[in-house]
Amino acid sequence: MALSNSTTVLPFLASLWQETDEPGGNMSADLARRSQLRDDSKLEALYILMVLGFFGFFTLGIMLSYIRSKKLEHSHDPFNVYIESDAWQEKGKALFQARVLESFRACYAIENQAAVEQPATHLPELKPLS
């Protein structure tokens, strides 16, 4: 059975506290300074909690409004009804096909008549310098 060794920590902490404390310092001034620091730290903690609270409140509000705006099940808005229908997709396909056909009609090739009329003529080439 292992015995707890919690009593050995207390002398170590006491000696550590005495080393960090100023020797010959004014004890009442030191206590006043420490109490003032404790009051300030309470206000700092309150300030941090308030900032986090406001941030959380605004974040929650933005998140809920975003979620609410994405619910389209009960929306009878004409735009949402139009998006849910397939009519716009059919119109989009027809418009895409018309544009493709129009672009094919606008494309044409220009041929070099001199090259077509003389297919047996040898074209000059640059000979590599070796």
Swiss-Prot record:
Main location: membrane
GO biological process: membrane repolarization during action potential; negative regulation of delayed rectifier potassium channel activity; potassium ion export across plasma membrane; regulation of heart rate by cardiac conduction; regulation of ventricular cardiac muscle cell membrane repolarization; ventricular cardiac muscle cell action potential
Posttranslational mods: Phosphorylation inhibits the potassium current. N-glycosylation at Asn-26 occurs post-translationally, and requires prior cotranslational glycosylation at Asn-5.
Topology in membrane: Single-pass type I membrane protein
Transmembrane segments: 45-67
UniProt KW keywords: Cell membrane, Glycoprotein, Ion channel, Ion transport, Membrane, Phosphoprotein, Potassium, Potassium channel, Potassium transport, Transmembrane, Transmembrane helix, Transport, Voltage-gated channel
Pfam families to which the protein is assigned, alphabetical: ISK_Channel
Gene Ontology molecular functions: delayed rectifier potassium channel activity; potassium channel regulator activity; transmembrane transporter binding
Cytoplasmic topological domain: 68-130
Modified residues (Phosphoserine): 103
Residues with glycosylation annotation: 5, 26
Protein family (similarity comment): Belongs to the potassium channel KCNE family.
Function text: Ancillary protein that functions as a regulatory subunit of the voltage-gated potassium (Kv) channel complex composed of pore-forming and potassium-conducting alpha subunits and of regulatory beta subunits. KCNE1 beta subunit modulates the gating kinetics and enhances stability of the channel complex. Alters the gating of the delayed rectifier Kv channel containing KCNB1 alpha subunit. Associates with KCNQ1/KVLQT1 alpha subunit to form the slowly activating delayed rectifier cardiac potassium (IKs) channel responsible for ventricular muscle action potential repolarization.
Stated name of the protein: Potassium voltage-gated channel subfamily E member 1
Organism: Sus scrofa (Pig)
